[in-house]
Design a protein with these regions (language model features):
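Helical mechanochemical/support elements of P-loop NTPase systems and associated helical scaffolds
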Residues: 24-31, 35, 68-71, 75, ...
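Alpha-helical context
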Residues: 4, 8-11, 15, 55, ...
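Histidine- and aromatic-rich ligand-binding microenvironments
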Residues: 7-16, 20-23, 59-60, 65-66, ...
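Extreme N-terminal, non-catalytic leader segments
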Residues: 2-57
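Phosphate-binding loop that captures ATP/GTP phosphates
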Residues: 78-127
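Walker A (P-loop) phosphate-binding motif
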Residues: 37, 41-89
Length: 127
């Protein structure tokens, strides 16, 4: 079943933490807009047909505290602010998942519960 659950992120709160927002003009918005343009060009531009899974972006690093969550959230927010784009942000850090905490949402079942077989329906872990 397709559970059309809508979650809202308090943009005022995350803007105070330095995240991208559609409220006002800020340097962080401009910086991620530049990154977003390149990502969207790869995903949907002329090169998209020559690349496998061109619309998938992975933010990763072997080291903690390098800004992976910050970057992933900001890039997702920046793309989501586009009128014709949707974003699925997956926190695949199995040891220290932090996206929900960072955007101040309570923990809910997620990727690990699905992979461990505790949840059968993938739509139940998309929030």
């Amino acid at each position: 079943p397709n559970n059309q659950k809508k979650k809202f992120i308090a943009l005022n709160n995350i803007q105070k933490e330095g995240f991208v927002s559609n409220i006002g003009r800020h340097t962080i918005n401009e910086e991620y807009r530049a990154i977003k343009r390149k990502v969207l060009s790869n995903a949907f531009g002329p090169l998209a047909k020559t690349l496998n899974n061109a619309n998938i972006v992975m933010v990763t690093s072997p080291n903690p505290n390098e800004g992976k969550t910050f970057t992933a959230i900001n890039l997702a927010l920046s793309i989501a602010l586009e009128q014709d784009k949707t974003v699925l942000l997956v926190d695949a850090d199995v040891l220290r998942p932090s996206v929900m905490k960072t955007i101040d949402h309570p923990f809910e079942n997620g990727l690990m519960e699905y992979l461990l077989g505790e949840i059968d329906d993938l739509s139940e872990v998309i929030h």
